[in-house]
């Protein structure tokens, strides 16, 4: 009886030790970033690319979970600065966003996004100068006939204040001017839908949202194409940034390296309407200074 009782105690202790080791191993893996879930939040312009990367990465890395959410660049930068997510996606440099402590944020550029004005197909305009765009979005021009279009009231559709696409558009299309107060939308997809269905509407979206049901507007006579961004002739574009708080964990670093790899850039970046980093013939810093490679 005593021997049997002792054996039971030993067996129970063995089970407890094994369970403890398993819990410790799990906690260690999670702490070190191995197989920990990856959550990316922010730019809706960058969202389709990160979603494609996440889906593909999970197939080749079983056990890794990649969750991608929009919300705009401001949300992404705020969340990553707080350490609430793994990755913060942004169309602008963290230093450009007011209220963001960028000191501990590390920038990983993964693509370039062109941004184009779009208008409802009935306005009768397919080309605008930077000066005209500024006048329209600041409310100085309110009728399409004043820029060569139909006699129709201009309806502004803006991205939300925290949008990186909006910040990039105001910086590079409007020379830093602030858009007039108008209806705002959180996503590029919704913006495109509203412009399509609203007479007189104008807004702006990333090239990835280009479609035949709205008119893509030339800027200073230059078509919004990848080639024209690459050679520097088209002015409205931005780098797509993914920020980490400090150096990335092992899994997060692996995911970022995958997105920056030649294989991924060739397979997905251009296919989804972005511009590969290695295709750029110029480099532009945060102040707009351009150097040719």
Predicted regions and their residues:
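Exported/periplasmic ABC-transporter solute-binding proteins
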Residues: 2-74, 78-82, 86, 90-293
């Amino acid at each position: 009886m005593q021997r049997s009782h002792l054996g039971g105690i030993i067996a129970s202790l063995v089970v407890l030790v094994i369970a403890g080791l398993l819990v410790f191993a799990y906690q260690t893996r999670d702490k070190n970033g191995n197989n920990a879930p990856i959550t990316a939040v922010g730019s809706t312009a960058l969202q389709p690319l990160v979603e494609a990367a996440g889906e593909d990465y999970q197939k080749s890395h079983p056990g890794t979970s990649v969750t991608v959410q929009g919300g705009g660049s401001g949300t992404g930068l705020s969340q990553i600065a707080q350490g609430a997510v793994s990755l913060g996606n942004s169309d602008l440099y963290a230093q450009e966003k007011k209220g963001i402590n960028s000191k501990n944020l590390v920038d990983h550029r993964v693509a370039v996004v062109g941004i184009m004005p779009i208008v409802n197909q009935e306005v009768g305009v397919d080309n605008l100068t930077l000066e005209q765009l500024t006048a329209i979005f600041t409310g100085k021009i309110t009728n399409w006939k004043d820029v060569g279009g139909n006699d129709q009231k201009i309806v502004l559709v803006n991205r939300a204040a925290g949008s990186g696409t909006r910040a990039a558009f105001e910086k590079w299309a409007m020379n830093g001017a602030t858009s007039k107060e108008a209806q705002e939308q959180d996503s590029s997809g919704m913006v495109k839908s509203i412009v399509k269905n609203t007479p007189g509407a104008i807004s702006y979206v990333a090239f990835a949202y280009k479609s035949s049901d709205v008119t893509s507007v030339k800027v200073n006579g230059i078509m919004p194409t990848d080639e024209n961004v690459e050679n520097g002739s088209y002015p409205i574009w931005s780098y797509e940034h993914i920020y980490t708080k400090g150096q990335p964990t092992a899994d997060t670093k692996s995911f970022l390296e995958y997105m920056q790899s030649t294989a991924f850039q060739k397979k997905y970046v251009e296919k989804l309407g972005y511009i590969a980093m290695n295709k750029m013939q110029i480099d532009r810093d945060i102040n707009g200074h351009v150097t040719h490679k």
